[in-house]
A protein has these predicted regions:
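N-terminal Rossmann-fold NAD(P) dinucleotide-binding loop
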Residues: 67
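Bacterial N-terminal signal peptides that target proteins for export
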Residues: 1-9
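Flavin (FAD/FMN)-binding glycine-rich loop and adjacent Rossmann-like elements that form
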Residues: 25, 29-39, 45, 169, ...
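Aromatic, loop-rich ligand-recognition surfaces of beta-strand-rich domains
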Residues: 512-600, 605, 610-650
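Beta1/beta-strand and adjacent pyrophosphate-binding region of the FAD-binding site
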Residues: 50-64
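Predominantly extracellular/luminal regions of secreted and cell-surface proteins
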Residues: 489-511
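Bacterial N-terminal signal peptides
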Residues: 9-20
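Conserved N-terminal/central alpha/beta ligand/cofactor-binding core
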Residues: 26-37, 47, 55, 73, ...
């Protein structure tokens, strides 16, 4: 307990120390410089609304998981980034405001990694009780630890400034600090979901295409329509020892059994899963099926009306379940109810390519693949909660279907890219790629691409033409698996000698796959994970993939938050380790002892890590001439041996 408290305090302390680098603090400093501390401010000498200008290479609009991953990936590769978020916390639908579970691929071997997995393991480390408000700050820490990111919270994009066909700047408003911002950049990434940068004139779609538009057999509508999936307000429950009846507000709906006669699970069809309202159990229920109609309401412009309607539904549902005579929810109390509806669907930009049902069903074999999905084609009924019967229909698809780069940049605004649920897809394909783990992968891909565009002085279209293979290599090196290919291992790693049992560390497959382990085990203190060369080589970087147990589904936040059970770190992950190099002895001693003799050199520690919680670890150190490199595991997170998927040297 004491250690966890210290870790949490360290997290908060690190956050507070990092804040002064942010653009909002810059605004405060500017205001302080312009006022006399000994002068009373009045209507004659005070400015009610400040106006501040800022600029960066890359402007990311939207601080959900796709925006966070885009900003962090671009910043880590060297670009100057501004991240704009209209809420007081990051995370979007995954934040404490909305509490939607992070889902994506359903198959163990295809589970998402990259920055998303890093944040989820960080959450285990700092937030083992899985409290949502602390999860907000875990995401926050991931962002503010990056020196190349300036974060603008509570800041809404209101307009754009155009320079011909390109976006030159965004106009923003922060009602929290009464400040107007003009934020300029070279590239603009729309990760808002609703597509606010449509203000630029970028082409987009809203609604559902006709079945014939892309030949999508899972659709039934013969004509285009404005129907979308609806928004949801979620509930969280608390286990209780006593039953106390629940009284909903007078303005809530009041339901009876007659309202749910059609909501009984029925047999499924092969390849199709039929989902109904889960009104018969309280345990393990996050109430995703409480959904406001995307037919009756516009999910963007009717947001206030949807909020009220969803509150009426949510209170009414809980009153019905809690007080039901069969006692289905008697052991639970309502612990939390959302206030902001989480959105599923609104806007989809138009890119050079539009992902469709057939692309998903066939596996998404694209030359320019940069991300992947694995959620079913999960098309929610547009009538939402008030539909009598089905809540959603899931069409089962192959796991790990590819998502191409050509879906991720505007067809008519040359410096606009996008990530998350506003990328270029049909409505049916969207029903699978909209979930947050997939959106996070897309965000990391777009952020990495954006940095490369800045670095090479090209455009999104130019990157597709000239550098797509390089982008794919960088993504794989950053622990983003891509379908139908494996990571390229560095030539220096492949040129080394190592024991036969160590070969999986350099096969480029950084996870269990098709029944193959693809890893090695090492007990603390063992020195057998070693690469050697006949002649000294120059080494300054190492890369590891440790086992974070991608199979564990418990990384998503709990549906019952009030539990006191702590979530442990993945036991086979390396907690502490050293990287050591062997410095060759002088030439005469080598000739005397034989250069192949391990005693002919001295082992030197060039890097040491403690309390590691990352799956991907990259370390740099001063360039050294060496004929051997090894990792020495000092400690695991509980297992007798650590499990390591990759060990690369450069």
């Amino acid at each position: 307990m004491k250690k966890s408290i210290i870790s949490l305090l360290s997290l908060v302390s690190a956050m507070l120390m990092t804040i002064p680098a942010g653009a909002q603090i810059t605004g405060v400093e500017l205001a302080r410089k312009s006022q006399d501390p000994n002068q009373l401010l009045t209507h004659e000498n005070d400015k009610v609304i400040r106006e501040i200008e800022a600029d960066a290479d890359i402007i990311v609009c939207g601080g959900g998981l796709s925006g966070v991953c885009a900003a962090v990936s671009a910043a880590r590769h060297g670009s100057q980034v501004i991240l704009i978020q209209d809420r007081p916390m990051l995370g979007g639908n995954a934040s404490s405001e909305m509490r939607m579970g992070i889902v994506g691929v359903k198959e163990d071997q295809c589970q998402e990694a990259g920055i998303l997995e890093e944040m989820q393991c960080r959450n285990f480390y700092y937030n083992p009780l899985q409290r949502y408000t602390l999860w907000d700050d875990v995401i926050y820490s991931t962002v503010v630890e990056e020196p190349n990111i300036r974060l603008f919270l509570n800041t809404s994009v209101e307009d754009v400034v155009m320079d011909g066909e390109k976006i030159a700047a965004v106009k923003c408003w922060n009602s929290n600090n009464y400040t107007k911002y003009t934020i300029s950049g070279r590239l603009f990434l729309d990760c808002t979901g609703d597509g606010i940068l449509r203000l630029s004139g970028a082409e987009y779609r809203r609604g559902t295409e006709a079945k014939s538009t892309y030949g999508e057999s899972y659709l039934s509508n013969e004509k285009d329509n404005f129907n979308t999936m609806g928004n949801s307000i979620l509930l969280q429950l608390r286990k209780t020892d006593e039953h106390h009846p629940f009284t909903a507000p007078d303005w809530a709906y009041h339901f009876t059994d007659d309202d749910f006669n059609y909501d009984t699970p029925k047999s499924t069809i092969p390849g199709i899963k039929l989902n109904y309202k889960i009104i018969w159990r309280a345990h393990d229920n996050n109430f995703w099926w409480m959904e406001c109609s995307g037919v009756k309401f516009d999910t963007i412009h009717d947001a206030n009306e949807i909020q009220y309607e969803m509150k009426r539904i949510a209170y009414g549902v809980w009153e019905y379940m809690k007080n039901h005579p069969d006692g289905r929810a008697k052991d639970y109390d309502l612990d939390w109810i959302g206030s902001i509806p989480a959105k599923r669907e609104s806007t989809r930009y138009v890119a050079p390519y539009t992902l469709t049902q057939d692309d998903v069903v066939s596996g998404g074999h694209f030359e320019d693949v940069v991300a992947y999905g694995g959620w079913t084609l999960d098309d929610h009924n547009p009538n939402g909660f008030m539909n009598k019967g089905l809540a959603s229909t899931e069409y089962i698809v192959n796991q790990g279907y590819g998502i191409p780069y050509d879906c991720l940049y505007s067809v008519n605004v040359p410096n606009l890219m996008f990530a998350g649920r506003d990328i270029s897809t049909s409505h049916m394909a969207f029903s699978g790629i909209r979930v947050m783990a997939t959106c996070a992968l897309i965000g990391q891909a777009v952020g990495t691409a954006a940095d490369m565009i800045i670095d090479k002085g090209t455009t999104p279209a130019g990157l597709r033409k000239d550098y797509i293979s390089e982008l794919q290599d960088v993504l794989e090196d950053d622990d983003c698996m891509l379908p139908y290919r494996w990571r390229k291992v560095s030539p220096l790693t492949l040129s080394a000698k190592t024991a036969a049992e160590n070969e999986p560390m350099r096969n480029g497959i950084d996870r269990e796959w098709e029944g193959e382990d693809n890893g090695v085990y090492a007990a603390p203190g063992e020195v057998n994970l070693t690469y050697t060369w006949e002649k000294p080589v120059a080494v300054s970087n190492v890369r590891f993939i440790f086992d974070s147990d991608l199979k564990v589904r418990g990384k998503r936040m709990r549906k019952l938050e009030a539990t006191t059970e702590r979530v442990p770190m993945p036991s086979e992950m390396v907690k502490a380790f050293k990287v050591q190099v062997r410095v060759p002895a002088d030439t005469r001693k080598q000739r005397k002892l034989n250069a192949a003799d391990p005693a002919a050199g001295e082992w030197k520690t060039v890097a040491e890590v403690k309390d590691n919680f990352r799956r991907l670890v990259k370390l740099s150190f001063d360039l050294v001439q060496t004929d051997a490199v090894r990792i020495v595991v000092d400690e695991t997170w509980g297992a007798e041996k650590a499990h390591i998927f990759a060990f690369d040297v450069k």
